[in-house]
Structure formats: C-alpha cells, structure tokens
Amino acid sequence: MAHHPRWTMSQVTELFNKPFLELMFEAQQIHRQHFDPRHVQVSTLLSIKTGACPEDCKYCPQSARYKTGLEAERLMEVEQVLDSARKAKNAGSTRFCMGAAWKNPHDRDMPYLEQMVQGVKEMGLEACMTLGTLNDSQAQRLSAAGLDYYNHNLDTSPEFYGNIITTRTYQERLDTLEKVREAGIKVCSGGIVGLGETVNDRAGLLLQLANLPTPPESVPINMLVKVKGTPMADNDDVDAFDFIRTIAVARIMMPTSFVRLSAGREQMSEQTQAMCFMAGANSIFYGCKLLTTPNPEEDKDVQLFRKLGLNPTQTDVLTGDNEQQQRLEQQLFNADTEQYYNAATV
C-alpha cells in the first residue's frame, strides 16, 4: 500500500482560492516534475451495452428513468467489440475502454467480458472497463483476464452526492474501488463539474480521490454534458476558468496520476482545452463518442495537437511498438490525414 501525505479540506480550499495564474504556475511546475508536458495519453471509449440502466444518476441519458430518445441495446458481441478495438488501435489509441450501462454485471456476462479483455490485450492495447459495482469474484476474474484499468467515478463530494444519485451509495463506490485495487487492477476514478455543486463540493471530491490509500492512476474530470430529458438538462454552464482551476488542483493533489479531459470537451474552445493542458491534463478520449455524449471530431483533435505541439504518449504495454507510435504521429501531424475511427458509427 502506497504511503502519501493526506490532504485536509482547508488545504484543498486554499488551492481553489489561489490567484488563477499562481495556481496554474504551481500546477505546471508539478506536472513537469512527473511528466513530459508535450505528451498526452490517448484513449478510445466504446459503449458495449447502451441504455436501460436502472440507476437514477440525474446527469445520465443512459438511465431508464428519463426519456432522452436513447435507444437501449444489448451487450455487444465479442467480435464486434474487438473489431472496434482494432479500428481504435489503427487510429492511434493506446488504451481501449469498454463501458456498460449496468448497476453491476451479472455472472452470466463475465465470460464474454473476459474474452473482450483478453482480445484487446492481445492487440497490444491497454484494456479498461466500466461496468458498475463489482464483487470480489468479478474483480478477480477481470484481473486474471488481464484488465489494466477499471473506471468507477465518485462523481462529486459525499455531501452533494445524494442530490445526484439515490440508487447507489457513495460507500458502494468506494467499496468497488477497494475491490478493484485489491485485485491488482489500476484505478480510474474522477468526477463531474457542473452538476450544481459548490466549489467546496469540487474540493471534497478531489479530497476523497487524493486521500484513497493509493490515489487513482487515472483521474477523469468531466464537464457536464446537458442532455435533453435528464433532470440536469437546464443546469447553468460551467465557467471555463472554474473548470481549468479544478484540473489544476487535481494535478497538484495527485501529481503522478494521469488527469484526463473527458466528457464535455466538445463544448470547450481550443483555448480552454489548451489551458487545461497547461493546468496538467495529460490524457484525452480521442475520436469517439463518450458512451452517449459527443466528443470532438478526430480531425479537430489532430489540428489542436498540431497547434500545441503535443505528442501521443507511448504506454508501458506498447513499449517498443514503434509502428503504433508512428501511425498516430503520422495522423496527428500530416495535413492530408485520411479517415479516423468513430465508435458511434460501429
């Protein structure tokens, strides 16, 4: 178990209250101590089972409780998923994330999920899944199949959480993260900005994440995507500086974690995204829809990477796979790039 300093709420609040430019400077300094600031890790996310979720998360179009026009789909066939993973690899992603709209997976689904993980790993990609609550046996089985990362977000602070979700407790989420960690799988966990939370709630979320026995290796920070039909469709927009500030504080508090720009990037300007990279974000979802929300078209990402001089990160599992690295670099920096993968069309 890792030993790291525990943060206090007053320390986190102090960070959020820092003058913006001072905060950015501190975050960038810490970022450079642990990462190459020119490198960004690239992931692709595929919804392997969409809609009809029994949970009541007020932000989510996948909930069966809200009329969002989202058509429910059954669990995809293994070969369909692996075909999508091949396309993702050819487009340059180094991690393939598979998400299912469940409260928890059923044991009958586990053999298919294990085959998906094994197939993705055989391609030389990192494998990540987000399937809801796991029990010990399921976590161990996914670990044995080779799963690298498991995503299970805390979403917000413990104090605000009950305003967003009532069908799953905060402790259930923490318990799943513990089971995943004990099974030897890396943890991916973050939250959402724009749920109607206060700055103290954002501080409380990051406090929970940073004070886990081992902080998450990957911390996705989402900006709420307002979907018609959900209770949060009319929420106020998030101020760009408030979002960037959250990224910066996450970077300072979890200096060795990958901080990922996730949902909501489509509604961010290039300037906002650039400031997020300055604040310490060093991972993105590339070229697909984030489960059911739009993500910027790949060519826009290519252009932004080129403008900022950013390069895709080579992950540990792909060390020595120069062909893979060159493919993505060619797509990112050649003006006449061809078609890119979009999971939504599969």
From Swiss-Prot:
Catalytic activity annotation: (4R,5S)-dethiobiotin + (sulfur carrier)-SH + 2 reduced [2Fe-2S]-[ferredoxin] + 2 S-adenosyl-L-methionine = (sulfur carrier)-H + biotin + 2 5'-deoxyadenosine + 2 L-methionine + 2 oxidized [2Fe-2S]-[ferredoxin]
Start and end residues of each Radical SAM core domain: 38-256
GO molecular function list: 2 iron, 2 sulfur cluster binding; 4 iron, 4 sulfur cluster binding; biotin synthase activity; iron ion binding
Binding site for [2Fe-2S] cluster: C97, C128, C188, R260
Gene3D superfamilies associated with the record: Aldolase class I
EC number in record: 2.8.1.6
Database matches in Pfam families: BATS, Radical_SAM
Binding site for [4Fe-4S] cluster: C53, C57, C60
Free-text comment on the cofactor: Binds 1 [4Fe-4S] cluster. The cluster is coordinated with 3 cysteines and an exchangeable S-adenosyl-L-methionine.
InterPro entries assigned: Aldolase_TIM (IPR013785), BATS_dom (IPR010722), Biotin_synth/BioAB (IPR002684), Biotin_synthase (IPR024177), Elp3/MiaA/NifB-like_rSAM (IPR006638), rSAM (IPR007197)
Pathway note: Cofactor biosynthesis; biotin biosynthesis; biotin from 7,8-diaminononanoate: step 2/2
Cofactor(s) the protein needs: [4Fe-4S] cluster; [2Fe-2S] cluster
UniProt KW keywords: 2Fe-2S, 4Fe-4S, Biotin biosynthesis, Iron, Iron-sulfur, Metal-binding, S-adenosyl-L-methionine, Transferase
CDD domains the UniProt entry points to: Radical_SAM (cd01335)
GO biological process: one example: biotin biosynthetic process
Task of the protein: Catalyzes the conversion of dethiobiotin (DTB) to biotin by the insertion of a sulfur atom into dethiobiotin via a radical-based mechanism.
Subunit structure as annotated in this protein's UniProt entry: Homodimer.
Protein family: Belongs to the radical SAM superfamily. Biotin synthase family.
Protein name (Swiss-Prot/TrEMBL): Biotin synthase
Organism name: Enterobacter sp. (strain 638)
Lineage, broadest ranks: Bacteria, Pseudomonadati, Pseudomonadota, Gammaproteobacteria, Enterobacterales
